[in-house]
Amino acid sequence: SDLLRYFPENPGLRLVVDVERLASPQTIPMQTSTGDVQDYDRFGRFRFEVDGQPAELTIFQNELGFFLPFVDSLAGGETYGAGRYLEPVELPDGRFEVDFNLAYNPYCAYNENWSCPITPAENRLGLPIRAGEMTFAAHDDPPQA
């Protein structure tokens, strides 16, 4: 659809990272956009760099698998204000592939009836992730004649 927009493919944001796993996963209740709570386990953290800027994110896990919600510094402008989601892939050697080119907007970006986990504060980045899905175009104001 014309309404979905993506940043150009960015090979530098397709990462393979070492995750510092927590000795015992902590369950945290993640608030959702509809006021519910969904439980996730805090699985581990990883460090990475974007254009030389250090950053760190937490990977969460539930019965559906691994989950990486994040908010970058473009949120509310080029990227969706409530953040984007990613499913990190565990590799055979125990590292994880984190490909920000696959970052997507939560369903609640398109329909407020969906219940979407709200990105925890620990996954709010002070730098831009120019990869993956951009803001949903339908939310933009139409151009003025």
Where are the model-predicted features located?
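A short, structured loop/turn motif at beta-sheet edges
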Residues: 89-96
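Short acidic/polar inter-strand loop motif in beta-rich domains
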Residues: 105-107
